[in-house]
Amino acid sequence: GETVEHFTDGLETYGDQADRWIVDLRGNGGGVVDAAIGAVSTFSGSGLLAYLKDSDGSYGAFGSNDEALTTAPVIVLADENTASASELFASDVRDTGVGIVIGSRSFGKGVAQIVLDENSLPGYFDNGDAMKITTYRFYAPGGGTTDTVGVIPHLLVDPDLADEVAVLLCSPAPEGSTEGYLRLDFNRVWYISLEQASSPEYQAAFTALLEALPVGVTLQSGTGSSWAAVEPAAVAEACGLTGYQSRGFSDTAGSPYASLIDRLAAYGIASGSGDGTYNPEGSLTRAELCALLAKALNCRVPTGESRFTDVSMDDWYGMCVNAVAALGLVEGVGGGRF
């Protein structure tokens, strides 16, 4: 189709000039599943790229037999309006390891529809009438669905800064001395020029990038002849990024779950106590569990009356409890109470 031709033409025309690719899917509401699979295969090559599940629970596998047109990594930009087939493209990039996703969590429409009209069912529809029916839920190669949950980007940043963050990651590998560069090992190897990143034009994006780095991702600073591990906070201080704020918590270092807690914080799922602490040894109430699950699952905000007599929709946890209950993940204690 036209989408795949666009990607093919771009990669073939500029392939000898580019060592990074950026696909901006911010505000892209999706389209045809086949187009998303064909487009992402220009980066990933042959293999399975999606599974579609119908109402009977049967799965169909979809993929490509074509070879990749580039070995350079791709950066996908996403926001809350990146939806449907665009989310499949982003999740394919994530699961195949051919690049990273930058921006905010996507919309969460992981279903496909068919259209019944006079062409597909002549005699049943006329005068331009048609009916659209949701028939499939799709899953990425790794087995996860984007439906409701959406795609959580590798680097969770303000979508308005996503393009500038991507540009910072497009610095070429240093030739000779590594001094003045950062190296980021995250799905692929990325380089950041400190001169560019510290400039007034890119300081906000650089700050956002450092804040978004999750635990376990290796950040290194050039020493001239080699690389040395460095913490994002140390880089921010050295570069005078006064607006930098770590998303981690001050009281998790001694916890056996510290890395997991801080990773959830990096992706905006765990918010802690509001004062920079998490209280990792504390107990979790049922309401707090629902709040955590609702955030992790990207639950839709419920409307109407609460299904529990002791939970008001005006309570800070009211919408979360009702959203998670609507999914069947929690139940009340009986008598209409939670």
Named regions from a protein language model:
Residues 91-92, 264, 289-293:
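Amphipathic, non-transmembrane alpha-helical segments in extracytoplasmic/periplasmic proteins
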Residues 132-136, 292, 320:
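Conserved "repeat-terminator" motif of extracellular CCP/Sushi domains
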Residues 85-86, 286, 290:
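Active-site nucleophilic cysteine motif
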Residues 267-269:
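Short proline/glycine- and basic residue-enriched helix-capping loop/turn segments at helix->loop/beta transitions
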Residues 223-256, 271-287, 294-319, 326-338:
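Feature responds to low-complexity, polar/acidic, surface-exposed segments characteristic
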Residues 44, 94, 265, 325-326:
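Alpha-helix C-terminal capping/helix-coil junction sites
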Residues 1-245:
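C-terminal "post-core" interaction segments
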